[in-house]
Amino acid sequence: MFSYRPDVLRELERHGIRPNSGTRPELVRDYVRELYKYEIRRLRGRVVAREFPKSEYASRVDALRRQYLVLAVPARQFTVEDE
């Protein structure tokens, strides 16, 4: 069983992710990473379709990266030790 840190749960909730105590942190992190990769591909498609100038791409990628700060946390640190 896993006890997720409250701050990690808040960040996951921003992306609609609600792991239960039986969900492995590695699985959760992999899922978040796949969401991020999807968003990056979508953003790239938008710049190719000229929905916004190429000069804005880097700042939009940075803004997107900041929405996925939980990816900076190793999966093993998603949880707290049970007392």
Placement of each model-derived feature along the sequence:
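Short arginine-rich
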Residues: 67-75
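Long, non-catalytic architectural segments outside compact domain cores
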Residues: 1-31, 75-83
